[in-house]
Amino acid sequence: MYIKLLNENELHHGFQYTIGKNTCQDFRQDVNCNYGLHFTDNLNVIKWLNMCPNTTHFREVVSFENMIENKSQHKYKAESITLGPKRDISEFLDTFEKQKIAVTQDGQAIRYIQNPSFEIQKLAVTQDGLL
């Protein structure tokens, strides 16, 4: 699954995202170039959540055109992406196993988990070196 993380107003680097098709008018094919619509996958979403503290929700990228993968940064970019409905970050972390992986990668990910269990809380604190 491909995922676009977004803030409350869905405005990112001057581009206003919406449900449905979104197209970058300044797209460039260069993998190291910022010109394009960036997104990640479900295996790397936690890395990006912690780099983007204003994230409030996500949308699934249901299709894309002219995708380029940037393996070193764990992200993709495309000229055009079609986004699904707005979903709360907590939906992505809806199972104990997903929560455990998230806080093991970065204890700060706990802020996206609704009602974390004591074990998840302990893992998060331990990960951040507070225990």
What are these regions (language model features)?
Residues 1-130:
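Short, glycine-biased loop/turn motifs at secondary-structure junctions and
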